[in-house]
Structure formats: C-alpha cells, structure tokens
Amino acid sequence: MKNILKLSIAEMHDNLKKREFSAVELTKLHIEAVNNEKLNAFITKTPEIALSAAEKADYIFTHQKENLTPLTGIPVGIKDLFCTKHVRTTACSNILKNFTPQYDSTVTKRLLDNGAVMLGKLNMDEFAMGSSNSNSCFGHVKNPWVRADGVEVVPGGSSGGSSAAVAGFLCAGALGSDTGGSVRQPAALCGIVGLKPTYGRCSRFGMIAFASSLDQAGVLTRTVEDASLMLQSICGYDIQDSTSANIAVPKFSESITHTIKGKRIGIPKEYELSGKYQEYTEVSEMWAKGIQYLKDEGAEIIEISLPHTSYALPVYYIICSAEASSNLARYDGIRYGARISSDDINEMYELTRGHNFGTEVKRRILIGAYVLSSGYYDAYYNKAQRIRHLVINDFVESFKKIDYILTPTTPKEAFAINEQLDTLTMYLNDVFTVPASLAGLPAISVPIGLSKSNLPLSLQVIGNYYDEGGILNVASIIEKHTGKILK
C-alpha cells in the first residue's frame, strides 16, 4: 500500500471499511505528521480530541456499520475562523488570541457529527483578510511546494493553513472560508482542489464574520471526489443563519458522471490577460489546454462576455471593507476581545484596537469607515452596490446560453515568501475569483499542471446557482486529463 497519509478520503474510507488499518492508527499517523510539520499550518493541535473521535469511529466500523458516513474516521483540519467548542478560536488575531468558544459553528458540528476527526485549528490571514497567509499573528505559512530554484513560496490565502495542510499530507481535507477567493486561490497555489459553494448553501453560524454578504464556508481536498464528500457533510439549511438557503441538498458524488458531452462551456474574453501582461502567458496556455480537454470530451465551447469584470475588484474591496469595518466594530476590549487598559476610555479603545489589529485589518477598517461616511456613502458604497448588481446580471445573462464558465483561478503562480508586493498587486491575486463571489455563485479550483518553475497552476469552473454537482463534474474531467500533480 502507498503511503497512508497520501491516500484520498475515498481511499481512506475504503481501507477503513476493509479494516486494513484502524481509525486510531490513521489518526496517530496524522498526529505524528502534524507534530513534525515545518509549514506552520496548524496553530492549535487537538490530539486528545482526535484520538477520542477515532476510537468512536472504530466502534462504528465494527459495531454500528449502519451509522457509517464517507467521513467516519477521516482526519481533517478546521480553519481558525470557525468556532470550535472548548477549543481556542482566534481568527489569527491578537485581539482574539485567548478566545475559547462555548459552541461549535454549524459547519464544524456537521463535519464532526459525520464522524470526521478534528486534528486541530489551521493558520490563516487575520480575520480572513489577505491572499498570502502572511497576515497572521502566528506567523506566515509555507507552501509545501518549493520553486525550482529552491525559493520558498506562499500558500495563498486567506485559507493558507488549510491548503498547505492538505497539500502537505497533514490532513485528508480541511474546512476553509471564501469571501473573495480564499478557498480557491490557496487551493490553486498549493495544487489541490478548493470549492466555494453557492452563497447560502452552507451556514455561517459560528463563523467569525469578515464581510457578511460574501463570506461562505468551503472545502479543500486533494481530489474532486473528496471535495464532493466533504461538501455533502456541511451543506444544508440552518435556522440559526438568516442567509441560509432552505433548499434541498442533492448527493453531489452522484453528479460526477465524468461525461460532459453537449454541455456548453463559456470562455469569458475579459479574463484573457496575456495580451496585456507578458507574465500571464503561462496561465493562458494552461487555460487553453483545459479548454481543449473539455472540447475533446464533447463539450461545446462558446466565447462569452462579462462586460463589467474590470469593475469587480474595486467594487469587492469597497463592499468587503465596508462590511468589515461594521463587523469588527464589536472588538473594542469591552464587549469582545483582548483589552489594553487605560484610565481614559478613548485611549483604551485606541490602544486596544491599534495594538491588537494587524496592518491589513486596520487598512480595511479605515477604508470601510471612509466609504460609509456621510459625505462619501453615495460616491463609493452605494455606487459599488449598484455595480455589483451589474456584475451579477452579466452572469445571469450568460447562464441563459451556457452551462458553465471556465477561467484561470489565479493570474500567475505562487510568489516568494519574502517578496514584497505592494497592496494593489497583492489584491490582484483575486482578480479571477472575486466576480463569482460578488454574484454568490458556486466555483471550484482544480489543478491543470505545473509552471516552468515547478509550481502548481489551476483552472476555475463557475456554475449557476446551486449547481455544485455540475461544477464538480466538469472539474473531474480536467482532473482526469491532468492526473494528480501531488506526489
């Protein structure tokens, strides 16, 4: 048998059913890997909780087989944005460094109720704001992939700990969150699968808020099939979340038919950047390869236009910053968060928020406060919301004549950890993922190959609302042609 840690979730499940190894043995191997990791992916480790869950899983495998699920006994990691009962949850911010919730987030509870084994909490950009996982009070995360010249690179963000842990074989799958690309972009840079479901498909209860109209839980796995299994366990209506969609959840794995003959694939001309920027040529070549794969399988390729794409990124950063400034107002050291004491209440607020929030979080709070201020609300926030509707309408009109959209996930490969990028260049990492987030559409990132620097490149499949099964199927075709790039 190949290295047990490198098995997919589906393969682990099959071997557990055959009793080739026990859930406890599987968990102990993962605990050892987590304890010896050099990626800084796990910030809180829960070996006792994991072993207890594994023992329960083994009992189910031997005595209660009727209660088995595809995730029973499977070791997973949880992004530190999701509340975990009696386990520290910090959003990787100093202001929450000692916060221990008294309840689980809905998606965490559903994952654990399905028998998954929690190995611990995963590193991330502070409050999910970032695309490199360098904005964490616990330090940056390393990508398991190293550039051909030996340079270490970022894992992407904000779910960088999740993507690095899965790609580094520290856990079989991980929970992440996606606001503007925070599941898909790190998955792309680490060469794994990352899926953001339709907004409302998964509950946000117990998920520390960044931008409430955009935040959505997602999954990161090493295969498309595994993504369908993890997603199945966390979806569903939740009365505790007013934005949760009360809509039936299909069996996603049954949608993976490995056939797309006759399906119409839209190729948006606005996503082609190689003519403007030479460094994007390699990504465009991989995009063309993916298009050919789908064409060879009988799909119809149709060029489409999403005319307001160029506005998506600035609109996103106005809206998400506005919502962040509102959501993070509660962390004042009195109601929530660590406090730096002072005899003067205004000075206490200033010290508490000034010292406990990181640079990127403070930047977005300031931008958000500015665009929501009385003199600029109409000029910025209100206008951004109007343009958001135009972006949504572009997708609505396109899906009248196509079934899926295929794009690159990121404009280029992962950059070096020590590379100093200006803020605008950093924000451009999300240029291909943000439009689907603004529209609330489901989207999946799947590896397409390696760059000349031996780093992963990926493609994104966007589907219509609640068609997670469909995008999983299209992604499976690309996966079939590409094969696993993780060794």
UniProtKB/Swiss-Prot annotation:
Single Gene Ontology MF annotation: glutaminyl-tRNA synthase (glutamine-hydrolyzing) activity
Protein name in the entry: Glutamyl-tRNA(Gln) amidotransferase subunit A
Keywords: ATP-binding, Ligase, Nucleotide-binding, Protein biosynthesis
HAMAP family given in the database record: GatA (MF_00120)
GO biological process: translation
Its biological purpose: Allows the formation of correctly charged Gln-tRNA(Gln) through the transamidation of misacylated Glu-tRNA(Gln) in organisms which lack glutaminyl-tRNA synthetase. The reaction takes place in the presence of glutamine and ATP through an activated gamma-phospho-Glu-tRNA(Gln).
Pfam families recorded: Amidase
Family classification: Belongs to the amidase family. GatA subfamily.
E.C. no: 6.3.5.7
Record's subunit section: Heterotrimer of A, B and C subunits.
Gene3D superfamilies for the chain: Amidase signature (AS) domain
Nucleotide-binding found in the keyword field: yes
Catalytic activities: L-glutamyl-tRNA(Gln) + L-glutamine + ATP + H2O = L-glutaminyl-tRNA(Gln) + L-glutamate + ADP + phosphate + H(+)
Active site (UniProt): K79 (charge relay system), S158 (charge relay system), S182 (acyl-ester intermediate)
This protein's GO CC annotations: glutamyl-tRNA(Gln) amidotransferase complex
InterPro entries the record matches: Amidase, Amidase_CS, Amidase_dom, AS_sf, GatA
TM stretches of this protein: none
